[in-house]
Structures are given as C-alpha cells and as structure tokens.
C-alpha cells in the first residue's frame, strides 16, 4: 500500500523528532556518567531502546509495504544497536573499565543509526516527490514503477485495473472555472481514496483520469467494485464555494494477467472506458480476455 502525502509528512516529522530525542538521550547519558548514576532505565536497561519515544513509535509504525520494510527493519536494528553500545559504554565508564573499543563501538552505532534514518527519509521523499501536487495521490510515475511488483504479489487474488474518467469535465471548467474544477478533482480524489480498501491504491493518471488498482478473487467481484465506485460518485455531490456540483464517471475495468506490461492493461481498460463514453457515460464497462466489452 502506497502511503498518502499526509502519512509521509507525519513519518518525516517523527524521524526529525527522533534526532532531537536522541540528542537529549546523549545529554542524559553524559549527566549519568558524571554523576556515576547507573540507575536510569532509559539508558541502562537491557531493552532501553524500547523505552525511548522513537522505540515506542517504530513499534507501532505500519502497515508497511514490501519496498519499505527493509528500511524500517534496518532503522530498528541500528536503533537497538546504538542503545546497546551506549549502555555498555556508560557502564564501562561508571565501573572504571572502559576501553577505546567502547567509544569506537558507540560512535559506529550512532553513525549507523543516523545513516539508516537518512536512507529511510530519502526513500520517503522520493515517493513524496512523485505524488500529484493537486490531489495528493500517487501519480503516473509511481504506478509505472510499482505495477510489476504489485502484479507479481497479487496472489491469491487477481489484479485488476480500473480506469475512470470524469464525464464532461470540460463543461465543469467552462461553466465554473478552473479553480472549481480543481476542487472537483481534489474532492473526487479524497472520495476515491476513502472508498477503496487499504491494500488498493488510487492514482491520478492525468487530467481528469484516475486509476484504481483492485484486487479481487474473480471478474465478477472486480466488476462489482467498479459499479460500486461509479454509483458512489453519482450519489455524492461535490461542495464548493458557490454551491454543489454533481458529477459522474465512466470506468473501464480490465484484469492484469501475469507478466503483462502496464501499458497493455491500460490500453484494454481505456478501450472499455471509451466504449462506455460512446454508449451513454456514467457506467462501468468490463473488457475480458477476448477483448469483448460489456456493461456491468
């Protein structure tokens, strides 16, 4: 599951707070060394990494996708290692048996932790930079880069691509202006994200087109999902500064078969959607393996 921009921003904020919290931890450690005080559990406990703010936060971080998981695991491991090295150094100083190796290990632990944080930040910022600015949804590039992975890991379900286009969107812009048109796009993006399941992702593909990656057991279930989305759009007016707008969408749904390139799947879904536009709009069309298109 690809994170929303608000989720990415919240994680980045917590990563920055982690640095600040561990500066405070270092000061507390220096104070304990000077005072010869080995009683603080956040420093000397064998599981001190789980007592700090960052340790508690990372334990509740999720859900994580397969690409993100290695970064978080490395960060968690480096965090534990840093705390362990800090504890061993402090106790060695307090008990007056420290060696240069204790300082070297702690320095390495600090550097490894900050490097792991930086790598995770870069990963998140890369995703963030490919988000659509207007809607906050992942954009076309994110879909291009993640589709093959999603297709390989869809089992035991099948992967379907739903291409949606707002009906007569040019008329909305011509009638109300582009600022209201932007409100329509942003609001629809929010609606679509809230109407899909956690493991399904909505993308802004371009203009007034959106793509939803749907996981379903069979064609019938995928078609029901498509019809449900179209009906929900039809039944939810969009509020703007001057009142309300009712919009509809036309959708084309196609199954993605193993090893199929994204452009092939989109091409099929686009043909189905175009057929829906030509036959009345505000409907969901399904294209099967034989390229037969039917309204669902």
From Swiss-Prot:
Organism of provenance: Escherichia coli (strain K12)
Expression triggers: CsrA binds to the mRNA and reduces its levels. Expressed at low levels at both 28 and 37 degrees Celsius. Repressed by RpoS.
Annotated control of activity: Allosterically regulated by zinc, which seems to regulate the activity of the catalytic GGDEF domains by impeding their mobility and thus preventing productive encounter of the two GTP substrates. Subject to product inhibition by c-di-GMP at a KI of 44 uM.
Pfam families: CZB (PF13682), GGDEF (PF00990)
MF term (GO), any: diguanylate cyclase activity
Role played: Catalyzes the synthesis of cyclic-di-GMP (c-di-GMP) via the condensation of 2 GTP molecules. May act as a zinc sensor that controls, via c-di-GMP, post-translational events. Overexpression leads to a strong repression of swimming; swimming returnes to normal when residues 206-207 are both mutated to Ala. Overexpression also leads to a reduction in flagellar abundance and a 20-fold increase in c-di-GMP levels in vivo. Required for aminoglycoside-mediated induction of biofilm formation, it also plays a lesser role in biofilm production in response to other classes of translation inhibitors.
Domain of life according to the entry: Bacteria
SMART domains (UniProt xref): GGDEF (SM00267)
Tagged with keyword GTP-binding: yes
Protein name, as recorded: Diguanylate cyclase DgcZ
């Amino acid at each position: 599951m690809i994170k929303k921009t608000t989720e990415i921003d919240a994680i980045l904020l917590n990563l920055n707070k982690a640095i600040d919290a561990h500066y405070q931890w270092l000061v507390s450690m220096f104070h304990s060394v000077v005072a010869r005080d080995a009683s603080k559990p956040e420093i000397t406990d064998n599981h001190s990494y789980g007592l700090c703010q960052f340790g508690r936060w990372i334990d509740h971080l999720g859900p994580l996708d397969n690409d993100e998981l290695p970064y978080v695991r490395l960060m968690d491991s480096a965090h534990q290692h840093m705390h362990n090295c800090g504890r061993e150094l402090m106790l060695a100083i307090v008990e007056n048996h420290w060696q240069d190796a204790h300082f070297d290990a702690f320095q390495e632990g600090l550097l490894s932790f900050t490097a792991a944080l930086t790598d995770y930040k870069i990963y998140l910022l890369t995703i963030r930079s490919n988000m659509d600015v207007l809607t906050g949804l992942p954009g076309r590039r994110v879909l291009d880069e993640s589709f093959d992975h999603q297709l390989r890991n869809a089992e035991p379900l099948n992967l379907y691509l739903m291409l949606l286009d707002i009906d007569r969107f040019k008329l909305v812009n011509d009638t109300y202006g582009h600022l209201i048109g932007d409100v329509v796009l942003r609001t629809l993006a929010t609606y679509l994200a809230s109407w899909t399941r956690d493991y399904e992702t909505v993308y802004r593909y371009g203009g007034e087109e959106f793509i939803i990656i749907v996981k379903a057991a069979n064609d019938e279930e995928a078609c029901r999902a498509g019809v449900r989305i179209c009906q929900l759009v039809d039944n939810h007016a969009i509020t703007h500064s001057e009142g309300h707008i009712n919009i509809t969408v036309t959708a084309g749904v196609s199954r993605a078969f193993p090893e199929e390139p994204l452009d092939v799947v989109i091409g099929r879904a686009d043909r189905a959607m175009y057929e829906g536009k030509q036959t009345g709009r505000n409907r969901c069309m399904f294209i099967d393996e034989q390229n037969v298109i039917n309204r669902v």
